[in-house]
Amino acid sequence: MCGGRGTRLATDAEKPLFRVGGVPMVDRVVGALRDSAVDRIVAAPSPNAPNTRSHLDVPCIETPGEGYVADLDAALADDRLSRPVLTVAADLPLLNGEVVDRVLDSHEGGSLTVLVPASLKRGLGVSDDTTFEDGGRVVAPTGVNVVGDGPDDAWLTRDRRVAVNVNTIADARVAEQWL
């Protein structure tokens, strides 16, 4: 998923192309997927990120750029994808193949949402704009999911590699400390 506007990032660069540690975030995510057991990578840019589409060297499914959920729905409706589908946000510069493989190993069918404790995000010093209660804990989605057919499940981890989403310049500084 690489079509966001990145308004909270407050930069001229398209969010997926924003450099963390000198490398565009989307390149870091594609690299993590290539280093994992994922067998096919398809990007989902939008009109909000035209330079991202031309930058990528993987097949793309154009999305409408109307927000994460609408873009995800558009991507999943494309005939080139079949479920289950691993979805990953382009703003996870610490992601690596090992973490991706752990997510895949945790998927037991249906859909899987990867969550982190909101307290972990706060402890790391990164933004936690979206939180909710799950099983008596306040958690935050990571931007990593498996979308399948069947029951929904959640996987809670304390792994900073999925906890650090870059939404602000301050988040980028935190990410760079862990590279």
Give the residues covered by each predicted segment.
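N-terminal nucleotide-binding beta1-loop-alpha1 segment
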Residues: 1-13
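Short beta-strand/turn micro-motifs composed of small residues
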Residues: 2-3, 44-45, 89, 115-116
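Short catalytic helix/loop segments, enriched in acidic residues and glycine
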Residues: 15-29
